[in-house]
Amino acid sequence: MTADATPYVTEDGRQIGGVMMDLRDITLRFGGVEAIKSISFDIREGEIRAIIGPNGAGKSSMLNVISGFYKPQEGEVHFRGKKRPPMRPYQVARQGVARTFQNIALFEGMSVLDNIMTGRMGHIKSNMLAQAIWAGKAQREENENREAVERIIDFLEIQAIRKTPVGRLPYGLKKRVELARALAAEPDLLLLDEPMAGMNVEEKEDMSRFILDVNDEFGTTIALIEHDMGVVMDLSDRVVVMDYGRKIGDGTPDEVRNNQEVIDAYLGVAHD
């Protein structure tokens, strides 16, 4: 079965593309516990797709399935119309999938620049022997990678801290550096696990702006987990809602916020 290439029009009239990733009847177990229970949904080219739900709903487990960290016992992942065989995370990354983590995973003793450079590993083609024999080619590759990183640094407005060790940065800037490292991989699909966690209002506004700009200017498809419902409703084209490993809602932000099962399980009241 091929992916649905039919464009989709969002609530604000923006047209997004056909299906990039299709998750079909995904079930994930840890021992006798079902973390994900036969969930299906898709992610379309160019959209911002939110995954929400209470703590323990299985949201991060779903991101781990998408990124190859977890192997579901049942179900299939289809990427651009082809069934994806079992893959390790680095193989999934080579397909154009990058992610950030709920808990920041940066190299604290390294500079901002060097941390972001680690995101370019998939773009380094020359091995050590090739670098020794064809020094000029290796140098050109190094320059290209550094130029790509510098563009991201400018884009995320972190020029002033580019040489600062990450361990000295406040939390909000660390989250921005982690986003920069993920963008350095030039992903087609970017997975963000609670990108606003621990941020103050100003930091959330900045991160929201950057996420929208990444989607708009780079054309990057984004799937994100977020607990701030204001952020979710403002950023997302579509939202899937999980509760105790089940899917209880899926649709536009308006459809989700008016879904009675979602209100009862998670939102509490309809959000204006």
Which residue stretches match the model-derived regions?
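Glycine-rich phosphate-binding loops of nucleotide-dependent enzymes
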Residues: T2-D272
